Amino acid sequence: MRHSASRPAELPRAARPSSLRLLAPAALLVCALFYLPQMRAQDAPSPSGPPPPSSAASSEPIQQDDIQTLKVGVNLVNVYFSARDKNGYITNLTKDDCNIQENKVDQPIKNFTKEKNLPLTIGILLDTSGSQTNVLPLEQEAGARFLREVLTPKDEAFLISFDINVDLLADYTNSPREIKRAIDKASINTGTGSGSVTGHGQPRGTLLFDAVYLAAHDKLRQEAGRKILVLLTDGGDQGSQETLKTSVEAAQKANAIVYVILIADRGNFGTFGSIGAADMRRMASETGGRVIDVGNNGRRLEDAFDQIQEELRTQYLLSYTPLNPKTDGTYRKLELTCGKGLNIQARKGYYALAADSDKD
């Protein structure tokens, strides 16, 4: 199924299907790309940072009117985070070690747990555009190994490829074998596809932002527990209907952490340059993830997956009930500290809206 030039309409909630069925004509295949998954449990959204501007205006401040807001389903704020010092990840923190501020006001911590055993939903987003021609086999091997080592019976993963199209190669599964079969079928596509810049002739490009938006909005938004997206890409987007801002916004609303592994066949295509890398750093930072640049080195790619795996094993979940109970739509800035000299990786804030608000 493929993402067309127009943004997908929100699909009706339904039980998770074993396969996708066609819901629209070929020109509107985007509406059939994904079903909303069955909710495992009701989960309160974790904090969200303000979405970044598009790369074309990345140096300009974000205007308040341009920022969409995030609904808080219950009066509880969840903060997933990891902590590191110069020697690596810290795994023995307690509630008493940490302090959380909302708009510079200390908040009483209600819950504090390690998240190693919480169900995990992983979306792998695989760039299959021309820049990946000689590194795709490396990505396939390392990605399959990562999921084989990370997935437990209570976890699930899905696989999306993106180039001139956005394709769902594997729907939710906890079978590493099924994911590997799907990864092995991924192939480079530089021809004509169904996703394009509207009104600009033959569809072409790399629909990175569209892929992130669809993965977050249509696949992860109704899932509970920990949710991550792992992008393997050179960071360059060409032809997406979505923007950096809207794709990050979708990830924030889904409470998904975005990790980006920058990889490309730079010998033939060069690197997309500072714009793509800067966009990926902004996307990762705003969602509580990070960027790992591996060039076109297979060993460094495996190490990048190992780093993500280690981070997932050392995450914490901190929850608190805001002292300001108003669901007034204001942006609440968060600042989390856990002792001196520790690097805390977490989201930067959230918007408080009433649970029954229809606005996204």
Regions from the PLM with identified roles:
Residues 23-35:
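Bacterial N-terminal signal peptides
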Residues 41-360:
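Scaffold/interface architecture of coatomer-like assemblies
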Residues 1-20:
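N-terminal secretory signal peptides that target proteins for export/translocation
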Residues 2-4, 21, 32, 79, ...:
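Generic secretory/membrane-interface signal
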Residues 35-41:
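Sec/Tat signal peptide C-region and signal peptidase I cleavage site
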